[in-house]
């Protein structure tokens, strides 16, 4: 059976959050001291994850993305990847990139080709400020390692007005020199602030004016509140901006 929602949209893409734990403390995500975590008995083990994934694949899901928290800090991540790789489905993963170098071989062995890396700034100082960890160089080097090993890399960047919105063009310029794509994600604070889509989209649409190939991720932003604009290496003009 095909999974269809009330708007008649067919769903073939499943996201599985493997853990709520993370080795960063991003300011927009959690306080410096962390958050209360669920007991281990409330977290799915690898057999349960496989059983759920198998059921969805049998119901026409063709792609599964593993997320967190930080999925690569699960101690049984290699077992999970191996079991899911046995299913007829495309596997992808979203990570903060800190421990990627430890898992490159396993990711390759399990035919994971598409990896999204969360990186909100190209400044080492800003990275430390927003993540409360001094790991920028590690993450950036692991992105280069992914490229070297032939993975398809997409960078997810949360744009925060007054913090890193001045880096939009720097992010985009990077696609001229590295075979990567960028996806800008809106900042959605947890304090009840109203989201102003007109204000956000105006800032993001500066990119097309500079000659970059951009793709709006969904015409109706009501259904696309977290993915607004994707900047890719395709069609990029060979010039500085």
Predicted regions: what they are:
Residues 1-15, 25-27, 58, 234-239:
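N-terminal [4Fe-4S]-dependent radical SAM core
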Residues 34, 69, 120, 187:
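Flexible loop residues that form catalytic
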């Amino acid at each position: 059976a095909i999974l269809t929602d009330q708007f008649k949209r067919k769903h073939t893409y499943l996201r599985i959050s493997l853990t709520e734990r993370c080795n960063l403390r991003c300011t927009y995500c959690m306080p410096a001291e962390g958050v209360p975590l669920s007991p281990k008995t409330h977290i799915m083990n690898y057999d349960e994850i496989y059983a759920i994934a198998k059921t969805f694949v049998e119901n026409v899901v063709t792609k599964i993305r593993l997320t967190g928290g930080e999925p690569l800090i699960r101690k049984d991540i290699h077992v999970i990847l191996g079991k899911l790789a046995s299913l007829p489905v495309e596997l992808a993963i979203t990570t903060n990139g800190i421990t990627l170098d430890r898992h490159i071989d396993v990711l390759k062995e399990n035919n994971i080709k598409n990896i999204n890396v969360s990186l909100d700034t190209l400044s080492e100082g800003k990275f430390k400020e927003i993540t409360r960890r001094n790991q920028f160089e590690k993450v950036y080097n692991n992105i280069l390692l992914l490229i070297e090993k032939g993975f398809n890399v997409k960078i997810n960047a949360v744009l925060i007005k007054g913090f890193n919105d001045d880096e939009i063009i720097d992010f985009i310029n990077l696609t001229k020199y590295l075979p990567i794509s960028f996806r800008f994600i809106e900042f959605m604070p947890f304090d009840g602030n109203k989201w102003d889509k007109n204000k956000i989209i105006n800032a993001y649409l500066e990119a097309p004016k500079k000659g970059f190939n951009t793709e709006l991720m969904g015409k109706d932003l009501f259904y696309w509140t977290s993915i607004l604009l994707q900047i890719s290496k395709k069609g990029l003009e060979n010039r500085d901006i």
